Amino acid sequence: MTIALGRFTKEEKDLFDIMDDWLRRDRFVFVGWSGLLLFPCAYFALGGWFTGTTFVTSWYTHGLASSYLEGCNFLTAAVSTPANSLAHSLLLLWGPEAQGDFTRWCQLGGLWTFVALHGAFGLIGFMLRQFELARSVQLRPYNAIAFSAPIAVFVSVFLIYPLGQSGWFFAPSFGVAAIFRFILFFQGFHNWTLNPFHMMGVAGVLGAALLCAIHGATVENTLFEDGDGANTFRAFNPTQAEETYSMVTANRFWSQIFGVAFSNKRWLHFFMLFVPVTGLWMSALGVVGLALNLRAYDFVSQEIRAAEDPEFETFYTKNLLLNEGIRAWMAAQDQPHENLIFPEEVLPRGNAL
């Protein structure tokens, strides 16, 4: 029996090879296989958002004006969620709600599901792009892993939370003031700021900002003065092999300041990755819990004592009263489909009235 040793080579390139060559070619803007998902989805998500904020009203879904055409500005314009009566319908243009009528589709809130779903897949495509490029240049995939954190937050807030509620209506609309409204809603109806997952998210984001500031300042403080350029950016060759700052000096400085310091760069930079990513993951988990209407801390003993003793009040019981005010005000204004009517004496009054 004869055994032939050698490498198998194709005589001709098939369609996959041709596409792979073109997609992964070295060009100014890398496309890649991930680009087949990223670029169309990002284009449609951004296009839908610009279209909605420019032309489309929220009168039929929220009883609001929400477009530049109606007089809104960048901070008040939004692509609003569909009405609560449409529940979790995907609101396809050709579906039973719009029946192929583009104007009716926009009026019903179809642009929101369009932007939300294309936006989610666009973010996933961007993460896959980082995986693909890292693999191409033989890097580890920590950039993509880090980017999974904002994806988790987006998916939990815009998709999982409304799926746990009665409809897309309770998701945030895509706009600046609309997001603020959603934050107030979360506080009033879920007491979100007292949720430990929210606390971990805040600690992660603010802790990451602190770490970035400390790290950047420390590197700037310990730069070697071995270049004759006019400033930091001209003094060093970007391809030089040697380091441009002293880790030993930085370690000694922070050891004197805090008594402890990072001993090597790997642990330092992993910690800078770990803090914000873990914080965002935890906050995403908390939002999933809110989708199921899970409650966080309830200090019942303080509530009972405050109810029995008018002179006893804590910041916790005060916040509960504020939350009641938010609910009383927002329920009628924010959910017009419920036709809620509250007596005047229970509604908060302000200078705007």
Curated annotation (Swiss-Prot):
CDD domains, from UniProt? Photosystem-II_D2 (cd09288)
Q: Which residues bind a plastoquinone?
A: H215, F262
Topology in the membrane?
Multi-pass membrane protein
Q: Residues that bind Fe cation, according to the entry?
A: H215, H269
Annotated PROSITE patterns: REACTION_CENTER (PS00244)
Annotated GO biological processes are: photosynthetic electron transport in photosystem II
Known EC number(s)?
1.10.3.9
Q: What keyword terms does UniProt attach to this protein? A: Acetylation, Chlorophyll, Chloroplast, Chromophore, Electron transport, Iron, Magnesium, Membrane, Metal-binding, Oxidoreductase, Phosphoprotein, Photosynthesis, Photosystem II, Plastid, Thylakoid, Transmembrane, Transmembrane helix, Transport
Q: Which reaction does it catalyse?
A: 2 a plastoquinone + 4 hnu + 2 H2O = 2 a plastoquinol + O2
Alphabetized Pfam families for the sequence: Photo_RC (PF00124)
Note the SUPFAM superfamilies from the entry.
Bacterial photosystem II reaction centre, L and M subunits
Extra remark? 2 of the reaction center chlorophylls (ChlD1 and ChlD2) are entirely coordinated by water.
Subunit info? Answer: PSII is composed of 1 copy each of membrane proteins PsbA, PsbB, PsbC, PsbD, PsbE, PsbF, PsbH, PsbI, PsbJ, PsbK, PsbL, PsbM, PsbT, PsbX, PsbY, PsbZ, Psb30/Ycf12, at least 3 peripheral proteins of the oxygen-evolving complex and a large number of cofactors. It forms dimeric complexes.
This one is known as: Photosystem II D2 protein
Q: Which gene encodes it?
A: psbD
